[in-house]
Every structure is written in C-alpha cells, then in structure tokens.
C-alpha cells in the first residue's frame, strides 16, 4: 500500500521471475516487509506457481484471517512461514502492536487447519532468546512440524537493531 523507492512494478517482477527461471532457480520465497500488503501478491504468487517454482510465503501472519484464508489456500503455496518473535508480550513488543501474537498464532492455526504446510519462523536476538524453549513447545503443542530459526539479518530495521543480536 506504500510505494518504496526502487520497488519493482508487477511487470518488472514478472520479468525478474522469467530471468530467475532461465537461470534454473527452483524456489521463490515471497517476503517483505509484509508481502500480503502488496496489492498484486496473489497474482504474482499464481504466476510463480504457473512457472513451476516452489513458492513460499514468509509473512507475519496477522492478515491471515477467515476472509484471507481462501485466497492463501487457492494459491497452493508450497510453504507458508509465519514469524513469531517470542511469546505474547515479547512478540507484541517486537511488532509494536498489542494483539500481534494472537493474530499471528491465529494465522498459523488457520493455515494448519486448512491443510496448508505452515511453519513458525523465529529470529533469535538477545531480547527474545528467553522465549525460544516456549516457542518450540508451542510448535509441538500446535502440531507445527517446521520451526525455522535464524539470526538477525543486518538489513533494514535489523541493521538498526544489530546491537540486540544474540551473542554466544
């Protein structure tokens, strides 16, 4: 909903996908920011699927509700990864929004219950490392069989937060 300097137009995205396919790239992970905010995300996703890419969606999950779920399911994403930055208050603080954890978890559950291959994504920092065991337990309780653990990426807001990266 907000144009960013240098952001590709949808036709440019399609041309880039053509190039990636010609180079033999097998997988596209659509991420952001928040990819579900892009007005053409479902057209882009459908186009990628029609080209034979393995297509993943990396989202914060808050927009996946009962109204959005059929659109997500119709694409047939090979994988939907939903970011959880901690348990409840930790996640809400990271996302700067009260209720973000509940909304993200709702997205996980809706995808799971619809038969969409869904996983939890967790970026480890000093500020959320204490929640890692509880998140792994949550994934088990929710019958989510994929848990993706990553380090802080020093790009965008992550670069501003580089001091909070986990150090062991």
What does each model-identified segment do?
Residues 1-79:
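Conserved alpha-helical substructure of the radical SAM core
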């Amino acid at each position: 909903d907000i144009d960013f300097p240098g952001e590709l137009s949808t036709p440019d995205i399609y041309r880039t996908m053509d190039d990636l396919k010609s180079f033999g790239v097998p997988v596209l992970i659509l991420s952001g920011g928040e990819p579900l905010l892009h007005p053409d995300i479902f057209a882009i996703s459908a186009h990628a699927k029609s080209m034979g890419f393995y297509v993943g969606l990396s989202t914060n999950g808050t927009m996946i509700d009962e109204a959005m779920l059929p659109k997500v399911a119709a694409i047939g994403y090979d994988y939907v990864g939903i970011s959880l930055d901690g348990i409840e208050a930790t996640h809400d603080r990271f996302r700067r929004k009260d209720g973000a954890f509940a909304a993200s978890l709702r997205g996980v559950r809706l995808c799971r219950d619809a038969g969409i291959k869904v996983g939890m994504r967790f970026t480890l920092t000093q500020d959320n490392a204490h929640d890692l065991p509880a998140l792994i337990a949550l994934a088990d309780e929710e019958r989510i069989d994929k848990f993706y653990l990553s380090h802080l990426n020093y790009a965008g807001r992550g670069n501003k937060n580089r001091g909070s990266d986990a150090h062991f």
